Amino acid sequence: MVYRVTEIFKSVEGEGKRIGTPCVFIRLAGCNLRCSYCDTHYSQHDSDGKEMTLQEIVAETRRLNAKCVTITGGEPMLQDAISIAKALGWFECNIETNGSIPLPEKPENVFYTMDWKCGCSGMTDAMHAQNLQWLDENDVIKFVVGNDADLEQAKAVINTGIKAIPYISPIYGMIEPKEIVEYVLDNELDARVQVQLHKVIWDPDERGV
């Protein structure tokens, strides 16, 4: 099996429940959405990646030698991300997905981090609502927000009784993190506020971090 891969690198997890943990990132090329705030434009098209076999991906991941893996994109579910995770069965694998594609059953070593696209993304209508029912307590659902309307959307989804752990992140330059904190506290919302650690440590536009 051949994949289109933008990059494979080792860094620390920049967000979610493993934040700060050393991790190998496998970034697959190609995405079916065009979010307004996308920070990985260089991975939107299939042509942005190079061809790698499953065996080559596994070998490079082992060479980089971290205890966990994040498979991201682009949109990794456009390629067979599950087969990569199965081939890396001795690693805990986080598959980051944009929420528009029906999620397949996951192997034991996988958890999903699924976006729920709010209004500022321009991609809300692309969401596959049934995915909300498939996520479990080990999964993460991420809301990237830019204004009060986005926060209201996030609250509405969270209050449906989802099982996944909800995280709310700011769109940089549109909303201050403290505004999100105030909203979560004022609304007694069962959610975690986060900023992207890698954008604090490095330049927000730097790749391979």
Range-by-range predicted roles:
Residues Y3, C23-A29, G119-T124, L151:
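Short, functional N-terminal and low-complexity linear motifs
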Residues Y3, E7-K10, P22-C23, A29, ...:
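Conserved Radical SAM active-site core
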Residues T6, V12-E13, A126-A129:
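A generic, residue-level signal for flexible/boundary positions that often mark functional hotspots
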Residues V12-K17, R34, W202:
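Short N-terminal binding/cap micro-motifs at the start of the first secondary-structure element
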Residues G14-R18, G30, L185:
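Short secondary-structure boundary/capping segments within folded domains
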Residues K17, S47-K50, V69, Q153, ...:
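Short linear functional motifs in flexible/disordered or boundary regions
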Residues R18-G20, L135:
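A generic structural micro-feature
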Residues M77-V209:
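Conserved AdoMet/S-adenosylmethionine-binding subsite of the radical SAM
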